[in-house]
Amino acid sequence: MSSQVVIVGGGVIGSSIAYFLRASDPTVAVTVIERDPTYARSSSALSAASIRQQFSTPLSIEMSLYGIEFLRTLGERLEVDGHRPSIDLHEGGYLFLATPAGDATLRENHALQTRLGADIRLMDRDALKATFPWLNVDDLASGAYGVSGEGWFDGYGLVQALRKKAQALGARYVPADVTGVVRDGRKVTHVVTRDGERYACDTLVNAAGAWSRPLSAMMGIDIPVYARRRSIFNVSSPAKLAACPLLIDPTGVYFRPEGKTYICGTSPSPDKDPDDLPLDEVDHDLFDDVIWPTLAHRVPEFEALRVEHCWSGYYEYNVFDHNAIIGYHPDLDNCVFANGYSGHGLQQGPATGRGVSELILGGRYATLDLSPLGWERVLENRPIVEKNVV
C-alpha cells in the first residue's frame, strides 16, 4: 500500500523533502500544500540566497558541506525533460571579520570548520589588507575567508528547480491555505484547507517556514519559532571592489555583490525585532542609522552609495537556539517538523530533504545524522547555540 505524505509548505525545505521522497521511493504518494504558489512572500525567494560553512556548530557545517555539493551538481540532479536548471552559483566566498575582542572565537570556529573539511583561510590584518585593499582594517584583528564552497546563488531558481523536479517525479502541489488538522490521539489523520478540502495523511510534514508556528498550534504543539522580518537593500556605488566576497562585519552588517550593484542588510536589535511585522514595509531607519554608517566605515568608498531597491522577507526564527528543529515530536507519532532555520534554510534545504526522506522511509537517518536537531533538546532545555547567526 502506498504511503500518503502531506507536506505543508512548498518552499526550499518542503520541495527538497518532496524531491528526495519521490526520488527514493516512487510508491510514496506526496502532496505539497503551498499557500503562496507564486512565492511572492516566500522566504526562499526573498532571501539573500547564500551558502557558507562558517558556522560554530558541527552539524550546521556538515549540512552546508552537503549543500554546496548538491548545488554544484544541481543541473544534473534536477534535470527535467532534457532541461538542466541553473541557479547561477557564484562561489565568491564569505569573509567574516573579527576585532581583537572576537579574534579567539573566530579562530576557534575556523579550527572546527577546517577539521570538518571546509575550505576556510584564516587571515591576519596584513593579509586582509593585501587581499582586499579597499577594506578598512584599522580596528580588525583577523578574518576568515571561504576560499571555495561558499557564495551566493538564485534562491528563487533553486525553489523552482526542486519543485519542478518533484512534480516530474510525481509529487502533487496544491495551492491552498491550511486552516486546521484532524488529530486522533497521537496522530494527525487529515489536513483541512480553507476551501474545505480534507487531505488524508499517513505522515504530515510541517515545512511551513515563517508560518510554522500557527500550523504547529493546530497540531497542539508549541514551537519556539517566530516570523521575524529582515530587510534587504540593493545599493549602487561607484566603488569597484575587486574580488569582493560576502562580507560579514563584526557588527553583523553584511554586504555582497549583486551584478553591478550590492545587496546589504543586518538583523535589528532585539528590542526592535517583534514578531510578524508586515512584509510590505522596509526598515529604512535601520539602513540610515546602522547599515550605511557601518558600510562607510568598513569600505570608505561606500560613503557614496544610493539605494536602488529594497524589500523584506521573513526569517523563521528559532528563539530557543537559532538552529533548525528537525524530526518527530514525541507527542505525535506521524508528524515530522522541519522548522526554525533562522536564515539558513536555503543552504540547509538539501541536507534536510535527504535526511527527512530517510527518516520517513526508513525510520532513521542513513547518511548525516540530524538527530541532534530533534525536539528532545528543546523539551529538555539543551540549546545548541549557534554563534554565527547573520
Predicted segments with their positions:
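C-terminal catalytic lobe of FAD-dependent flavoproteins
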Residues: 293-390
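Dinucleotide-binding Rossmann-like beta1-alpha1 core, especially the glycine-rich loop
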Residues: 49-131, 252-254, 296
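Glycine-rich FAD pyrophosphate-binding loop
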Residues: 22-44
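Beta1/beta-strand and adjacent pyrophosphate-binding region of the FAD-binding site
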Residues: 1-13, 31
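Flavin (FAD/FMN) cofactor-binding and adjacent substrate-gating region
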Residues: 90, 98-169, 174-175, 180-187
